[in-house]
Structures are given as C-alpha cells and as structure tokens.
Amino acid sequence: MIASKFGIGQQVRHSLLGYLGVVVDIDPVYSLSEPSPDELAVNDELRAAPWYHVVMEDDNGLPVHTYLAEAQLSSELQDERPEQPSMDELAQTIRKQRQAPRLRN
C-alpha cells in the first residue's frame, strides 16, 4: 500500500522553486502518459511514489495546474499567507467541501 505524505486541500511548497500551491488530487503512482526520457528525467522509484496535482500561481498571479512528485514538495506550516490570499481561499474551499460534500443527482 502506498501512503501519501500530503492530503487534498493541503498547502504545500515546491521544494526547489519555493512556489506555494494547493493539492487538488493525488495519484498513487505516476499516471500521466509515458513521457520520453527528455521530458521527465526521473527514476523508477520516484515514479512509484505518490504524484500530486497541485494548483500554484504563476508570476502574474494566475492559477497554474502542475503535476509534481512527492519528493518535489514540502509541507507548508502556516495556515494563511497574506501575500497569496487566493491559495488560502482555494485550500479553505477544498477542505470545506471534503468535510461537508454536496450530493449530486
């Protein structure tokens, strides 16, 4: 069984770039189409670990969907960041929906 380090709705940081993001989905292993070696230089162990769909903001403040390995992320300890309120709002909305899901027809 593969355990993920981060949860849906959790705020995380890109370990190398420092960008703040919110986890919106988790894949237990790398699940996108098979990349060429030039596109993704990762080993098999990294591909077998959890991968995360993370929404981050670009330099213009626009949301960007990213697909990152668990090793590329670190925990974000603060609950609120005044410099990026949209990431706080997104995380809060996702957590609320997970606590009280709406029924769909």
From Swiss-Prot:
Which controlled-vocabulary keywords does the entry list? Cytoplasm, Stress response
Q: Which domain of life is it from?
A: Bacteria
What InterPro entries does the database record attribute to this sequence?
Answer: Hemimethylated_DNA-bd_dom, Hemimethylated_DNA-bd_sf, HspQ
The cross-references to SMART domains, in alphabetical order and at most eight, read: YccV-like
Citing just one GO molecular function, the answer is:
DNA binding
Location in the cell? Cytoplasm
Name a GO CC annotation attached to this entry. cytoplasm
Instruction: Tell me a GO biological process for this protein.
Output: response to heat
- Which portions of the sequence form the region Disordered? 74-105
For the keyword Phosphoprotein, the answer is: no
Q: Where is the composition biased (Basic residues)?
A: 95-105
Keyword Glycoprotein set for record: no
Q: What does this protein do?
A: Involved in the degradation of certain denaturated proteins, including DnaA, during heat shock stress.
NCBIfam families noted in UniProt: PRK14129.1, yccV
Give the matching HAMAP family.
HspQ
Homology family: Belongs to the HspQ family.
Which named protein is this? Heat shock protein HspQ
- Species in which this protein is naturally found: Shigella dysenteriae serotype 1 (strain Sd197)
- Protein encoded by which gene: hspQ
